[in-house]
Amino acid sequence: CTSYLPMVCEGNNSANKLMTMGLVGFVYGAGTSEDTVSQLTDLTNYGALKADPGAANANGFTSTQVGGIAGFSNTSRTSTFANRFLRCINHGDMTVSTGRASGIVAAANRYTHLTDCTNYGLNDNAFPRSGYARLGNITCITGPGIKFTNVVNRGDLISRTKGAAGGILCLVNHNDNEFIGCESYGRVISDRPDNDYKGTFFGQCKKAAKFRNCIAQGDVGTYNGGDCIMTGVNADNYMD
């Protein structure tokens, strides 16, 4: 399925209430068998996305979450089988002010596998709470049972308000997470220090997650009022 229609979210009137936006808003699977999970296959989005959080201006579960393909993916707490995104592609640029926003799925919360998915879209974010946004061009945050295989980001990510950001994801949040053959080539721009929740691949990882045959290229920089200043990531400084 392919969509060219723009998507607009005008915000939520209630605080502390989840709102999701994407070609698919909320992806759920009981996770007890292959027949009780959701599978998104060959979905492509070209439509631009615009979103405002309204009163739901948090950066956690009870927030407005925007993804080019899906807003949120989750399974039950007893799940052992995963929701699957296969060959999903986002070309749509995002102009949003939500606490979570991503090219593929804003939150890969539990048991979600992404395979051969690519983001080309720009993620331009102006979350009103300075320093609080969690942004990643594939996803913002992971939970248990997450596996990304051959996932690629080629879009830039800009946080105008010092948000935490990563080219693939913002927060690696479980020890069992796996990233295999994943690549990021986009710029990550935010007025934060380069090693403070900001990176070409992920913003933060304090978990024993597995990374195999991944590429972290692109660049990091500061927004600087719109006159962006890039660090110039290279082989000599990319591990700083």
Where are these regions (language model features)?
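Predominantly extracellular beta-rich ligand-binding scaffolds that present long acidic/polar faces
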Residues: 1-240
